[in-house]
Amino acid sequence: MSWIERILNKSNITQTRKASIPEGVWTKCDSCGQVLYRAELERNLEVCPKCDHHMRMSARARLHMLLDAGSEVELGSELEPKDILKFRDSKKYKDRISAAQKDTGEKDALVAMKGTLQGMPIVAASFEFAFMGGSMASVVGARFVRAVEQALEDNCPLVCFSSSGGARMQEALMSLMQMAKTSAALAKMQERGLPYISVLTDPTMGGVSASLAMLGDINIAEPKALIGFAGPRVIEQTVREKLPPGFQRSEFLIEKGAIDIIVRRPVMRQTLASILSKLTHQPQPSVVESKADTVAQPENQADV
């Protein structure tokens, strides 16, 4: 074998090894651009270990992070969306539903569960942004109301993680009706004196921000989450003025009094447990180790 053939053979081996690396092993941070090992990022609860950027997280991952292992019982899992209006834009609505269900593994954009948080019974709900932008439609409203009813039945708090672009246009008036429906359900919790904690994540916009997301007894936000009704570009085009830096971000809103506290994801679980123990007049629960307790954080980074 000549020296040229030996070099060519080595090159072919290298190319074969590169091609054998499975997809999805590495990902890039949306903020700093750092290439991250996917498994490490999942252990860090989708928080970049380099710049602390909070990436978007699936609904089930959030609920798994919050609730005690083995305590989760899903609510309203039998509810599925229907194309009652036979709506069509560039695609049929039923085709969009099928594609979203295939991509996410969820039937719709909200997952609700009951369980315990460090031994305290709670009900929790979380939006799935990957399902049609977390848009609120009939099934989302029905599942949220189911979660409220379960909290009323169990006489326990409700926690909701919002991540949504707003009402789902394909369901027209029926999606807008969910704003009133969910707000009316939360009024029953207020009458009973049961705590409702709203956690606003990136992004929380439109009809969701104008209803259930901002009705918490305590409104918590993750760092740098986009929160508002209309998007910044729409507002700039309407008022024809440049918006201030950080407009509609968590840090801007807390300065204006629109939210109560900003909490980093690694300490979200313990913070919620502490708040709920005070609101329900229960003893401070003992700390139960979870994924959130072992997350790496950048140097000089405050927890809350």
Swiss-Prot record:
It is found in: Cytoplasm. The gene is accD. This is Acetyl-coenzyme A carboxylase carboxyl transferase subunit beta. Pathway: Lipid metabolism; malonyl-CoA biosynthesis; malonyl-CoA from acetyl-CoA: step 1/1. Its cofactor is Zn(2+). It is an enzyme of class 2 (transferase). A zinc finger (C4-type) spans 29-51. Its main location: cytoplasm. Keywords: ATP-binding, Cytoplasm, Fatty acid biosynthesis, Fatty acid metabolism, Lipid biosynthesis, Lipid metabolism, Metal-binding, Nucleotide-binding, Transferase, Zinc, Zinc-finger. Coiled coil: none annotated. Residues 25-294 form the CoA carboxyltransferase N-terminal domain. Acetyl-CoA carboxylase is a heterohexamer composed of biotin carboxyl carrier protein (AccB), biotin carboxylase (AccC) and two subunits each of ACCase subunit alpha (AccA) and ACCase subunit beta (AccD). One of its GO terms (biological process) is fatty acid biosynthetic process. It catalyses: N(6)-carboxybiotinyl-L-lysyl-[protein] + acetyl-CoA = N(6)-biotinyl-L-lysyl-[protein] + malonyl-CoA. Belongs to the AccD/PCCB family. InterPro entries: AcCoA_carboxyl_beta, Acetyl_CoA_COase_Trfase_b_su, ClpP/crotonase-like_dom_sf, COA_CT_N, Znf-ACC. Zn(2+) binds at residues 29, 32, 48, 51.
